[in-house]
Amino acid sequence: MADARRRDALWRPDVLGKGFAQRTLELEPDAEGGVVATLVRRLPDPLRGGFGPLRGVDVLYVHGWSDYFFQTELARFWTDRGARFYALDLRKYGRSFREGQTPGYISSLDDYDADIAAALRVMREGGPRRLVLLGHSTGGLILTLWAARHPRAASALVLNSPWLELQLGQFGRQALTPLVRAAAKVDPLGRHPEVDLGFYTRAQRELGTLPHVPGAEAWRPERGFSTHPGWLAAILAGHARVAAGVEVGCPTLVMLSSAWTPPLQWSDAMTSTDSVLDVDDIARASTRIGSLVTIARIPDAIHDVFLSRAEPRAQAYTILDRWISGGALV
C-alpha cells in the first residue's frame, strides 16, 4: 500500500485537465544534455471499469512527427471499455521538450527503445497486463519496428495512418537515401528547406477537430518542426526495414483514409483526404509488417483518422471497436 502511494505521488495533473495525469521519465542524456520522456495516463472509472470488456488491458499510444498527445476522445474510447490508457510523449517532443534541444531529433529509431521501456516499467508497476500498442504516423513506424524487435511483447497493434513508406514511394526513397546518408555524415543537424506549408493543420482547424490546449502551442507548430539529415536518415532506415519485411508478432489493424491529396497547394479536398501520406503506398507497405494484418480504408478520413469530420471519425471508432472486440485480443 505504501509503495502504491509513493508511485501515485509521482503523477501530477496534466494540461488535458480532469482525468489525465502525467509522469516524467528520466532517460540517459545525449549530446544535447538531459533527456526525458513523459507518460500521460487516463484510468477507467473504478466502478464501471472492472466490468468492461477490456479490463486487464493496457494501451500505449505514441504520437506522430511534430506532435504530442492531446486526443482525449481516443483515450476515453479505451477507458470506457475498462482499459488503462497511456500515451507517451517521446524525447524532445511536447511535454518532454527541454530548452536547448532540437525538436523531435533522433539519429536512430532504435533509440526510442529506452523511452518505450521506461513507459512499460511504469505501466507494469501494478502487475503484468495485456498490451495494445497504438501508433499514429511516425509513431506507427516506431511501434511497428519496436514490436518486430520485441516478439510477443504486445497482444495487438493498432496503426493510425502509419508512416511506413516515404511520400516519394519506394523508388524515390531508394534514390534519395544515399544523398541523405552522405549529408547526415557531414552535417546531421543541418536544416532542410521547409516543405510543410501548414495545409494539414489548416484542414484540422477548418474541421474544428483540433482542440486548443493552453500552453501547448509550441508543441505542435503550424508548419511542423524543421527537419535534419540525421533524422531523415533514421526515418529512411526504418522505411527500408519495413520494405524488406518485418514480423510484429501480433494481430494488427491499419486504418487509413481512402484517398490522399498531395500537399502542393491548398485544396478543400484536404479536409476529407490524407494530405500527409500517400495512403496507397502505406496500404502496400502494411502487407509487409506481419502475417495477420487487417487494412481498413475509411472514406473522407484525414491523416489522423480520429480527427476527421464526424462521420468518418465515427466509422473509425466502429472499425476499431469491432476489431478489438472480435477476437484480436484472444
Model-assigned labels for residue ranges:
Residues 1-52:
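N-terminal cap/lid segment of alpha/beta-hydrolase-fold proteins
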Residues 56, 63-68:
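Active-site glycine-rich loops that stabilize anionic/oxyanionic intermediates
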Residues 63, 131-140:
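Conserved alpha/beta-hydrolase "nucleophile elbow" surrounding the catalytic nucleophile
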Residues 136-138, 142-227:
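Alpha/beta-hydrolase-fold enzymes
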